[in-house]
Structure formats: structure tokens, C-alpha cells
UniProtKB/Swiss-Prot annotation:
Organism: Nitrobacter hamburgensis (strain DSM 10229 / NCIMB 13809 / X14)
Subcellular location: Cytoplasm
Active site residues according to the UniProt entry: D13, H41
This protein's name: Adenylosuccinate synthetase
One Pfam family here: Adenylsucc_synt
Taxonomic lineage from the root: Bacteria, Pseudomonadati, Pseudomonadota, Alphaproteobacteria, Hyphomicrobiales
């Protein structure tokens, strides 16, 4: 028995929700360890569609314990709204099966306002954020001025912490020419939301440690993708947290030895939302076709995703930076019917071949992909549930990906339905 960490191996939107839900049946606990309510994911269970943003995917299964770890930035109003929405769909959620780290950093309205102000100030400097306050909240966390969940339970010290926070933010707001935040009004809002979120607060690191010692299976659910990691991604076009697998330890308070098997999720092609380098992007009718077939629009924002061929170099890089043991390859069915399929096997930078994406923003923009052409397949892979259901060329495509990225495929997904999954190796039994 082992615990499992799930991370996106590309730029997010890889289909983690379905895979986490598929794995959650075997887990006792599902825990989010980074990001915020910018990480939309969709679950389709028994014909019912659930759209999540902040809550762990395991929350739709009331028998599982779902946890939001300290590495997450937590919007209390978004939390309350999402819980209410799921309850309206018949999902049983309460403090008995959902816990939130008491030391989690809060996202406040002032964070969302600052995020939006920056993003809309100039198209030239836009990063492509969701404008939900994620980055500014992480800034306050690192700047040691953040309001944390447990602060809401301490009315004696909260006013001082709010004043410290507003000393910083009101200076920024004056510089931008917008109204300052009134400390009294903010304290009133926090007092109103406190009783709706504090019942979920817990010492998560301690809870998880006890559960691990009891032999419970823990599933760590990553958000976004490793290529959006603030250190290892395509900086500055990244998110504001670490998204690689190692963050599962830091973002929950567990030691690295508790993590176990690392499963990387990647599409059979590549997508990206927002700005930033994308070596294999297709700006032609093929890219449009992939986007239409794959329904490549953001769950939270509705933003159209950029589409391109599978980039084996980027996934291989993620396999190394996240220590991935096996891949879950999703949306293979979207490539059905193509005469040929291109796979990026390397890069050319200023006339020289290189085997990884350089760290510099300028170099990333100049990179040219080197492609290998693979014969496509006509027989549909949609809804396949075993290797025997797949056409020979589709199997060859999967095997070639394994060779190029240096990692085996543990799971293969052929539709949004959780049952349409081909299991090669069970991560919990690896």
C-alpha cells in the first residue's frame, strides 16, 4: 500500500478531475495542497456533472475525508458558495467529511481587486491570470502580513493583523488611484463569514499524520500543472505557487516520505490557457479542430484554450522535476481520425538542437519544435476500456510517448466518463 500524488504534467487542464475521482474510490482521504479556486475541474459521475474549483475532487463522495491543506490560498466566500452549490446537487458535505487547514491563507476582496487592476492595466504586461486574487494572496503570505483562517477565531489580535495588512494594501491603492479599504468594514465582513468557515478548521498536518499511522490511503490532488510552477514553469507566465509533486509535502505539513507514488496527468496533445510560450501551438484549422473536439474551454472562466501537438520534451522535463513514476494519458479519443499526428521530440534554438526548454523568457519564445510524424488511426478509441479495444496505431502512439518521455503509462483515458479508463498499473498498489 502507498499514498499517491497526482500532478498535472503540462500547463493544467489535463483531466485531473476524472483521474482523481477514479482513484478516490480506493483512497480514504483526498487532499488539496496548493492553488486556490482558480483551478476548475469537472467530474462526470453517473451522468451527473459536478464543477469544482476550490474543493478536493473527493468531496462528491461523502464517505471520503476531503482536506484543504495549508499550501492552498482560501477564499472563504468562494468556499461557502461552492459547498452550497454541491449541497444543492445532493452532495453531503459538512465538517465531518471536509476539513480545512487552520493555517491556510485567506483570499480577501482586496486581493481580487488588486489582481484585476494589475491584469487590466496593460495588455503588454498581462500574465493571463484568472483575476481571482491568487497571486496577491500568496504575496501577502510570503510578506508575512496575510490573514489566516485561525485568525478569524481570535478577535483580540485580528484588528492588529488587519491594520498591518491594510498599511500595505492601502498604499498600493492610493498609488493606483482607487479607494482605500476601511478596516472596520473589513473586520465586519470577516466576523460575518467566520462562523460559516471556522467549523471546518483543523490542524491538518496532525490529522493527516494520525491517519497515515492508521494505515489510511491518502490521495494528494494537485491543481494546475507542473509547467505553471513558479520556479520550474515558463516564468513569468506561471501561477503563484509550486505545482510540482514535492509541494504535496510542504502544502499539507507531511514529510516527503509520506508521499509515495507520483502520477502525472497529461493529454494526448497539449493545451494552454492565457499568455506564455507554447512551442507546439497550432494556429491553423487543425488546432481549431482539436479544440472543438476536446471542448477546450476553461471550467471557471470559459476562456478558450490554445491547442497544439504533444510536446514530449516538456512532459519529459516534468517527469524529472516532479519525480513522476507513471502517467495517466487522457483524451486519446480526440486524436481519432487524423491521417498523421505530430509529436515534438526536441527543440531548435538559434540553429542548435537542445533537449529541454530553456529557463529564459526570450529563449523560450525563440524555440522551434522538432517533429516526428506518426501514422494516425481511423478506428475509434472513444469509450475503450482495454488494450484490446484500441487500434494498433493508437497503441504505437502511446508506446512512442512512453519512450520519448522516459516514463510508463499507468492509466489511459478515452472519454470523460470515469469507467472509460484503461488500467495498466494501479498507483495505490505500485
Amino acid at each position: 500500500m502507498t499514498n499517491v500524488v497526482v500532478v498535472g504534467a503540462q500547463w493544467g487542464d489535463e483531466g485531473k478531475g476524472k483521474i482523481v475521482d477514479w482513484l478516490s474510490e480506493q483512497a480514504d482521504i483526498v487532499v488539496r495542497f496548493q492553488g486556490g479556486h482558480n483551478a476548475g475541474h469537472t467530474l462526470v459521475i453517473d451522468g451527473n456533472t459536478y464543477k469544482l474549483a476550490l474543493l478536493p475532487s473527493g468531496v462528491v463522495r461523502s464517505s471520503k475525508l476531503s482536506i484543504i491543506g495549508n499550501g492552498v490560498v482560501f477564499d472563504p466566500q468562494a468556499f461557502v458558495d461552492e459547498v452550497a452549490k454541491l449541497k444543492g446537487q445532493g452532495v453531503k458535505i459538512g465538517p465531518d467529511n471536509l476539513r480545512v487547514a487552520e493555517n491556510v491563507t485567506l483570499i480577501l476582496p482586496l486581493h481580487r481587486e488588486l489582481d484585476s487592476l494589475r491584469e487590466n492595466a496593460s495588455a503588454a504586461t498581462a500574465i493571463g491570470t484568472t483575476q481571482r486574487g491568487i497571486g496577491p494572496a500568496y504575496e501577502d503570505k510570503v510578506g508575512r502580513r496575510a490573514i489566516r483562517l485561525m485568525d478569524l477565531a481570535d478577535p483580540q489580535t485580528l484588528p492588529h493583523k488587519v491594520e498591518r495588512l491594510l498599511t500595505h494594501h492601502n498604499a498600493l491603492r492610493r498609488g493606483h488611484g482607487i479607494a482605500e479599504v476601511d478596516s472596520g468594514a473589513l473586520l465586519k465582513d470577516l466576523a460575518a463569514i467566520a462562523p460559516r468557515v471556522l467549523p471546518y478548521a483543523d490542524s491538518v498536518w496532525n490529522l493527516l499524520d494520525h491517519k497515515r499511522r492508521e494505515g489510511k490511503r491518502i490521495l494528494f490532488e494537485g491543481a494546475q500543472g507542473a509547467l505553471l510552477d513558479v520556479d520550474h514553469g515558463t516564468y513569468p507566465y506561471v501561477t503563484s505557487s509550486n505545482t510540482v509533486a514535492a509541494q504535496a509535502a510542504t502544502g499539507t505539513g507531511m514529510g516527503p516520505s509520506a508521499l509515495g507514488y507520483v502520477l502525472g496527468i497529461c493529454k494526448s496533445y497539449t493545451t494552454r490557457v492565457g499568455q506564455g510560450p507554447f512551442p507546439t501551438e497550432l494556429k491553423d484549422e487543425i488546432g481549431e479542430l482539436i479544440g472543438q473536439r476536446g471542448k477546450e474551454f476553461g471550467v471557471n472562466t470559459g476562456r478558450k484554450r490554445r491547442c497544439g501537438w504533444f510536446d514530449a520534451m516538456l512532459v519529459r522535463q516534468t517527469v524529472r522535476t516532479s519525480g513522476i513514476h507513471g502517467l495517466a494519458l487522457t483524451k486519446l479519443d480526440i486524436l481519432d481520425g487524423f491521417d498523421t499526428i505530430e509529436v515534438c521530440t526536441g527543440y531548435r534554438l538559434d540553429g542548435k538542437e537542445i533537449d529541454h526548454l530553456p529557463a529564459g523568457e526570450g529563449a523560450q519564445a525563440r524555440v522551434e519544435p522538432i517533429y516526428e510524424t506518426i501514422e494516425g488511426w481511423k478506428q475509434p478509441t472513444a469509450n475503450a476500456r482495454s488494450w484490446a479495444d484500441l487500434p494498433a496505431q493508437a497503441i504505437k502512439y502511446v508506446r512512442r510517448i512512453e519512450e520519448l518521455v522516459g516514463c510508463p503509462v499507468a492509466l489511459l483515458s478515452t472519454s470523460p466518463e470515469r469507467e472509460d479508463t484503461i488500467l495498466v498499473q494501479n498507483p495505490f498498489e505500485a
